[in-house]
Amino acid sequence: MSEESFDDTNKAFENEKDIILEKIVKDENNLNNCSNMINMDDVENMKKELYVLHKKDEEIENNVDCFSGDKYNVENVINLKKKKKKDEDTDSSYYKTTLDEVYDTSDISTDEMLSNYSSSEDNNNIEMNIINDFYLKDDNTYCLEWNSDIINVLSEEIKEKEKLLEDENKDICNMKSRFLKLEKYVNIKKKKIINIKKNIEEKRKIEFDEKEIFKCLQIKNDFLKKENKKIELEREKNNKKIIETQNNITTCQKNIDDIKKELILKENELNDFINKIKIIQQEEYEIEKIKLSKDKEIQNVSYNLEKYNNEKIQQDKKYEQVKMNNMKFDIELKSIIQEYYDIKKDIKNISNKYICIMDMIKCRDKTIYKFEKDYTKTIHKEKQLQNKCLHKQNLINTQKDKNIILNNQIKKIQFDINKIRKELNDKQMSYDKTIIDRDHLNKEYEYEIVEIKEKLQEEKKSLENTLQHLNETYITMSTNYEESKNEYEKEQVNNIEKNDLIKSSEQILVQLQNKLQKLLDEIKSLDLEKFQLTQTLQVIKNDYITLEADVLGTQIKIKQIKSNIKKTEKELERQKEMLYKFDFQTQVLTKKINMISGISTFEKKKENQKKIILLEKELYKNEDIYNTLNNEMKRINIEIKNIKLYQNELQEQKMNYKNLYEKLQLEIKSLESTINNEIKEKENIMLIELNLKIELDKLKSTFSKHVDNLNICKKEKKENMNNAKLSEQDINAHMESLKVIIKNINDEIHKLNIQLYEKKNKSNNLQLKLNSIIICNQKNKDQKDICPNENQHIYYKMKIDQDIINLKEQLKKINEQIDKENIETKNFQRTLDDIIQTNKEFNDNIKSIDPQYKILLKKKNKLNKKWEQINDHINNLETNINDYNKKIKEGDSQLNNIQLQCENIEQKINKIKESNLKVENNINDLFIKIERASNQLKKNLAPTTNMMKLKNKQIKDDENNLSNNNNNNNNNNNNINVNVNVNCEPVPLEKHIFKQIQMESLKEKLSLLMECFKNNIDNVIMKEVFNLIETAE
């Protein structure tokens, strides 16, 4: 029977081992599933519990070995009893102190405890009979050693143990009540933790949104980098285009220089032609002398000359047209040269603007370089922080090791239950106080929210008042604007004021760019602060996760402790049953002993002694079991104390984290409220800014249009002035040419009149009639020549008057446009002043806000303005680049037009060259023919002198006159040559043109002579001369 009981105990302990091992496996699975949510301390505690159970098994086996011996002495039994009494005394004193300090006492009695075990008495009686049968078979040698005193001692010990069991039952009931309370507390904490988890999930969502925003920022930064690269490529392309335009300009300059050189060469050629023409005139003069010597021949010649004069007038008109075309070409050359200089000026302006763009790009590159430096600094700081974190982690690990050592020491030390309970009460009081403080804080937070809303409403009202004031100011400004219009119509604003306004606007733009750079720097600082806040939030989250893991570990430990307590309760109930059975058997034995004492039979005594020995063995066994259970209870109590200490520490940590969490919640709510308010303000500001931007864009567009119109008007004005000057020059040149033509005509008429008067004396009546007819015809022709010239003068005067009237009208239009543009510039300046005033008022309103919210407002405004300014800057760069591309295209088109004009001029010059070559060839042919004719005339006239003796006198007289005239002409020619040598200065174009006209008149005269020869072939001399000319041809 003893072996079966030992097997039962071993099975019980083995079952406990299996249960604990299963729990360990489950815990390990939970660890893997929960992703390190449970600490390693729980696993270590479980291992320690296994170690304790192994020790218990070893102790039980040792005790079994002691009892399993066939023989043992009574002295050893007595010594064991004494030791047990001492242990029980110490245990009883310990339990008494604990029971006195328990708050709640249980009303459960021993009868109620035994009522549950009435059904198991029959089984116990059967077992006792089996035990008696077993022990009666043993030797009866040891039964004589027992006495009645030992039995009495055993009965007393049994009674004392019953009392101790009752006390332990009360303690167990109290412990149950306490654990129920702890379960309720743990459930409440679970609910709170669930709420905290929900809040954390909300925060995670917010953080996810922030990460998305950060990604968007990164994408925009990448986009800006790409655009910078594109701008650099466009800049290189623009540089190439500028170099090409410069090369084209140099080629144009070279072409113009070549044209000038060609013109100089042509002037020299014209001078050579003029000298040749003078020689031809001299020879012509000699020929005319020969004509005068022959009266009869001159009659026919004079008639033909009249025809020649008519043809000459027509050819003069044609020549004048050619001359006018040449003048137009000269004017076009001048206009092209002026356009070339204007293009140079535009190129200079473009180069200056390009330099400005390069400066802007350099500034931007500098800012990027600064950003890179700041980025390297931040990376260095991050490395330092990582090193610090590693150092702190090492310190934390060392502290954990120390904490483990301290925990082991604390487990060895036995804390008093009174102190623990007092601390629990104090902590409960503190927890209640914290709840009350939390309620107060929530109320204060709501009160502050209400105050903030009231302040925001007041600020809104103030802003509305400012808007009303601005509307009033706008109305007043509009009235002032109308007054200024009236004043401006009276007074003309100088162009200097416009330039000043433009300069002021440029200075404002420069200031805005500087502000933009400052705002970018501030945005960087805000980004760093945001990064630090995110890091702190991550640290807090990690701490909270560790707390949750600790709470789960404590809950698991509590469950394990509850299961252990239930097992101990079951074992205690079994022990009580055994003790009651033992008491019943002792009573039966006492009765039998009394019967034996009355009967005094020896055999019955032996039997009773055997039974007593068996009962004592069972008693020892039960006592050993009882001691082991007591030791387990003590160990469990110690573990419970340690658990309570650990729970207190966890509660303290939880309270601290709760406080931190509540503070963070308050801060987050305050930030959310401020952010919402700031978002509303931001939206209002954005609307205002959008309206202002739209107005600014409109003003800029109108301003640019007016500037373009001004430039166009200025160009038109210059062109009109140049055209007027050119028209005046054309008129003056035309007048001078007409005067010279009239003088030449009058001289020729005078000469012809002299010749006619000389011929009248010599000629007959027929000649007089012819002369009279000729004179009448000449007068009519002179009147006809004068009339068209006068009509031409009147026509040119009318044209000049019309041009002057048109120019005046254009000047009036230009002045009106200038006035409008000045008015619009004033309006633009007024709008800028209004914007500056609104900004000042807005800054004053911000200053009136509490200092606690100023920092948040600044941060918010900086973050909001950051992207707007960057986008504005990018848009401005794009617009500037597009403008420069347009201007470059315009310059290219202008250069192409200039090249086409140059090509047209070159073609015209080539045509003129060809015509000049043809004229030269014709003139050379005529000179050759005239020389041949003169030589043959001299040869033919020499033998005919004898045939004309009657006419020698007249010829001599004529020769004398001719000799005198030749001397005079020679003197004149010598003087002319001297003047030419002295005055080697270049002859003007007008004189060259008049000389060309004279040359054409000579050609016409020669053609008339040829006709005269053909008409007067009857004359012998004329026949001979004509034959000579034909042979020469």
UniProtKB/Swiss-Prot annotation:
Coiled-coil regions listed in the entry: 212-326, 405-582, 615-771, 797-1019
Domain of life (superkingdom): Eukaryota
Keyword terms, alphabetized: Coiled coil, Merozoite
Annotated GO biological process: cilium movement; cilium-dependent cell motility; inner dynein arm assembly
Gene3D superfamilies: 1.10.287.1490
Cellular component, GO, one term: axoneme
Biotechnology usage: Possible candidate for an effective malaria vaccine as determined by epitope response in sera.
Pfam families in UniProt: CCDC39
Protein name, entry field: Uncharacterized protein MAL8P1.12
Higher taxonomy: Eukaryota, Sar, Alveolata, Apicomplexa, Aconoidasida
